[in-house]
Amino acid sequence: MSKVRIYEYAKANNVQSKQLIESLKSMGVEVSNHMSAIDEETLNKAKQAGKPAAAKGQGSTSNQKQNSQNQRSNQGQKQRPQNNQQNQGQKQRPQNNQQSQSQGQTKRPSQASNNQSGAAKSQAGKPNQNRGGNRPGGQGRPGSNNRRPGNNQNRRNHGNRGGKRRPQSKVNHQQMPLPEKITISGSHTVSELAAKLHREASELIKKLIGLGVMATINQELDKDTIELLAADYGVEVEEEVIVDELDIELYDREDKEEELKERPPVVTIMGHVDHGKTTLLDSIRNTKVTAGEAGGITQHIGAYQIEHSGKKITFLDTPGHAAFTTMRARGAQVTDITILVVAADDGVMPQTKEAISHAKAAEVPIIVAVNKIDKETASPDRVMQELTEFELVPEAWGGDTIFVNVSALTGEGIDELIEMILLVAEVEEFKANPDKLATGTVVEAQLDKGRGPVATLLVQSGTLNVGDAVVVGSTFGRVRALVNDVGRRVKTAGPSAPVEITGLNEVPQAGDRFQAFEDEKKARQLGEGLMARYREQNLTASSKVSLDDLFNQIQQGDVKDINVIIKADVQGSVEAMKGSLEKIDVAGVKVNIIHTGAGAITESDIILASASNAIVIGFNVRPDVNAKRVAEAENVDIRLHRVIYNAIDEIEQAMKGALDPEFEEKVIGQVEVRTTFKVSKVGTIAGSYVTEGKITRNSSVRLIRDGIVIYEGELNALKRYKDDAKEVQAGYECGITLDKFNDIKEGDMIEAYVMEEVKRA
């Protein structure tokens, strides 16, 4: 049976600890003090055994109280005339004045004797003991001083504090039972939790001490501690869900199944440069747009619709992968289907691999369009073979990826491609509710001189009407005009329809969500709140995953897997590093390789890393100038290595939280080799121009050719004209020789850097 401390049992059962201890000792139970732990059955027996003694004690106590009250009342009757003499400012009866003087003089010795006897010790020794007239039998008399704040009523209660106030406080606790459930949001202080549980804070502090937690009344308690305390009282804890009133998604109601209707699919075309993406788009548009529309003035708004066999398809004309990734980075899932364009004569190229990585990261179906099959050098089978390496296996070979051979120039295969798009859309069952306020995403936005802010919107659900109040990202306004993809004004736009709107107060960003409202006042209020939040967010840098704080984010539950982009000088190194990283599994956190490639780290790699919250690992390669600039702006972590085991060990140690302080490389300058001179006994002298920063005599250098590190070491000599130089600033020419290396060519880049010791966060 569970044991309970004596003082806790006494408090819960409204008995005195002293009585319980005496009863337990009389029963032969060894008890040291009130903190001793005894089983409840023994305490119940001790409580029953102690009842007669307690009753007797209460009787004697009541007799003593009665005697003391009688003595006070006698003294009050004898000494009451004295009050009239002291309260001279009040009305007095003349016949009592003389009596009060004589009686006051005659009764003082008896009063002194009563004070010494101890019948009224709390009142006798004070000079103003008789000023108050609130004693028993003395209320309502003319001489009583009821208006004085510190009268004898308070003094009497103060004297009886031990006998009256404690039982009264216990009664109050019994009147406030424990709640069945409490609601919390975040952490609470001990006093706040005590108020919710209808208990004293001191009681909670004692329980916390029992749990090994030393807490004060104002100390914050976390959720786990609150749940432990509540469970001890048998109270259920419910966590309050904090609703963000500025979240646009809250204003989009859920659709019922019977409200959903079929909508056109939204298609994005991606692929390598010069593989015919734009030509394919133009071919689809020219063959499928009706003659009447084709004859009119077509306004390019970044998206357009075609109709085939009575069904519509929406195409997004996004310029390259950057816009696609930027929109996805902003949380916009716009695309339903991705068409991967691959030239039959070129095969899989670097940007093709990037497009595959982007499409897979967005988790959308991929249809491969093998373009340029009209060329003599076309080899569609080679394209299929190369794409199997990226898990894109043709249906003819037992896979699930649709391959279509097309020619954008001749129009061959265009109809089949469109039919395949409609087939995938039918299988995926793209649906939306057209009978509600519109929601969707910004495709493009710009500031027009004549019309002001102009935004191209893709309606994803509901119907947008002219005159609707809309909130677009952190901007707001009323729709003044709707223009469709062929430049005609329309009054409404349904699901999957691209339209251009005017009437916003500012230019939104691509990828922003929009929501239509019936109440313009509500839209304005929400838009202003979002604008204020957007400005605050711009002041704080966005949080990206980096190896320095990776372990902390894992501990906090912010990171469940690590997205990694691998770039190396050769494909063999890429495969080796990929295989080693995929085997790492620390603390249940998995390494997820989202993109690999051979060659220098480019701007598109950084954009993909930013969108996917990934870390870029470079092996024997360097980022180009644009990649460095974007990485710095987007706070993308780039890790460069020359030894493959160092890269693997660094990630593994970061996941374990055991990274040591490191030396961080700081690039101080870029130098371009413009000419070379070969001198006997000296070697090759590089006639160079400092394009950025500076180069110093004691700095380390690396020679980069076409993004590949050729040499890494020290300077042998740095000269300006014929003189040795300690450093050369940007905009000046200099002569450079490298230590034990002479294979320098025109166009090479020399990167100067120093190593600075830093401590990891």
UniProtKB/Swiss-Prot annotation:
Biased composition (Basic residues): 155-168
Classification via Pfam families: EF-G_D2, GTP_EFTU, IF-2, IF2_N
UniProt-annotated stretches for the region G2: 296-300
Region (G3): 317-320
Keyword annotations of the record: Cytoplasm, GTP-binding, Initiation factor, Nucleotide-binding, Protein biosynthesis
PROSITE patterns: G_TR_2 (PS51722), IF2 (PS01176)
InterPro entries: EF-G-like_DII, IF2_II, IF2_N, P-loop_NTPase, Small_GTP-bd, T_Tr_GTP-bd_dom, TF_IF2_bacterial-like, TIF_IF2
Chain segments carrying region Disordered: 39-179
GO cellular component: cytosol
Official protein name in the record: Translation initiation factor IF-2
Organism, scientific name: Shouchella clausii (strain KSM-K16)
Phylogenetic placement of the source organism: Bacteria, Bacillati, Bacillota, Bacilli, Bacillales
